Amino acid sequence: MKKILIILTNTRYYGNSKDKTGLWLAEAAEFVYKVQEHGYQVDYASVNGGEVPLDPRSLKSTYRSKEIDEIYYSNDFQNRALKHSLKVSDLDPQDYFAIYYTGGHGVLWDFPNQPALSSITNSIFKQGGFIMSICHGLAGLVTIKDDQGNYLINNKKITGFTNFEEILSG
């Protein structure tokens, strides 16, 4: 059975500051909860592989639920997503029927202009797979070009995180 590839950030800080960022927990955990509920298998990957930091703000009770916590506290998520994510460049796109770009501000630094992400996303798309993102995860899709040099999102309807949502999230 082919799997869904979940792309996570390795970025721990906003640019060169000491302000912490990372993966927005709910944007991975809610998705994982739903797809696993329907019998799909997932792999977790990041540009560098290895550790994936969590945005501390995403751990507030306001952004948590029973389902999010079920995934977050699971050994599988702790080990395969947060401690030992796979390195994107080591993966075979033939193993996946979909790719999902998670959010959190960290992705703004390590998702755009990444050859390994572009390559695996294009391959999954060319084999008829699904390309998905949530929130800031869209940053990973806006720079990807197809084999003809056209942006992959050209002539597609897309959504992303609004400035108003930035204000609401603090």
Give residue ranges: language-model regions.
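Extended, subdomain-level signal for the structured scaffold at the beginning of enzyme domains
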Residues: M1-Q127, G140-G170
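Conserved, well-structured core segments that form or line functional sites
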Residues: I131
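Short, thiol/selenol-centered motifs that function as redox-active sites or metal-ligating centers
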Residues: I134-H136
